[in-house]
Regions:
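A generic hydrophobic-helix recognition signal that picks specific residues
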Residues: 100, 107-108, 145, 182-183, ...
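Short glycine-enriched loops at secondary-structure junctions
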Residues: 115-116, 122, 181-185
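All-alpha helical catalytic cores of prenyl diphosphate-utilizing isoprenoid enzymes
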Residues: 43-50, 63-72, 148-157, 163-228
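Conserved N-terminal diphosphate/IPP-binding helix and adjacent helical/loop segment
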Residues: 1-103, 108, 112, 119-140, ...
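Short alpha-helix boundary/capping segments
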Residues: 94, 142-146, 215
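Multi-pass membrane catalytic core of lipid/isoprenoid biosynthesis enzymes
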Residues: 131-159
């Protein structure tokens, strides 16, 4: 499974599996989708005294969603182009683009939570989400809490995006089912990742087995398996 990931990444880097146009479409669409979901709408009953914090969380959702290789989204699009019928490649592209973006939004949710679990100060050279929110509220506890909720909102957003995209495709139930399976496997993988930290260091073979098991559940499930 590790070899599969390495080969896919190598293909993407050396053979140009996807064009710069794909990347531009992915980036702009992710921002559009995330903004629509997390930004309080005019008819949302948000107390005026709380609006600044709600707006800060919405802005951080966009900031956290920016950047990255977009390997998962690119692999989703390339899988679609490789296996879809010719007639579907144009008709279904917009829906598949949204589905690809949903995978990336879920990754962002996982990274926001990862940074809280790991107590990380930085993500992609900028303050991690919970650190940025702590700075804005002048409270580490509130920042962590808002970071947890931001991760939850992005995870929910990813399901909403995937569901809306799937409704425009055939076999929509299977698409949503695969997406939810990905969610479940990554979440189990995070539990296993934390469990490995409790393993004794005097059994290196078991450490290797447990670590590879984490890679299968937490990394491969949404980096290659789900996009393919």
């Amino acid at each position: 499974r590790i070899l599969r990931f390495a080969l896919v990444e190598r293909l993407w880097i050396t053979e140009g599996m996807s064009s710069s146009t794909d990347l531009e479409q992915i980036e702009s669409r992710i921002v559009e989708l995330v903004k629509d979901f997390v930004t309080p709408h005019a008819d949302d009953a948000v107390a005026s005294s709380c609006k600044d914090v709600a707006d800060a969380v919405a802005r951080q959702a966009v900031t956290s969603s920016e950047g990255g290789k977009r390997l998962r989204a690119l692999l989703t699009l390339d899988s679609f182009r490789a296996f879809a019928a010719d007639a579907a490649k144009e008709a279904d592209f917009d829906a598949v683009l949204d589905l690809a973006c949903a995978v990336e939004v879920f990754q962002t949710a996982a990274l926001v939570h990862d940074d809280i679990i790991d107590d990380s100060d930085l993500r992609r050279g900028r303050p991690s989400a919970h650190r940025a929110l702590a700075s804005g509220t002048h409270s580490d506890a509130i920042g962590r809490g808002l970071g947890i909720m931001l991760g939850d909102m992005l995870a929910t957003s990813s399901v909403d995006i995937a569901n809306r995209a799937a409704r425009r495709l055939s076999r929509s139930d299977d698409v949503v089912g695969a997406f939810l399976t990905m969610h479940r496997e990554v979440e189990i993988g995070q539990v296993l990742d934390l469990a490995v930290e409790l393993n004794p260091l005097d059994d290196p073979e078991e450490l290797v087995r447990a670590s590879l098991n984490v890679f299968r559940w937490k990394t491969a499930s949404y980096t290659t398996i789900a996009p393919l």
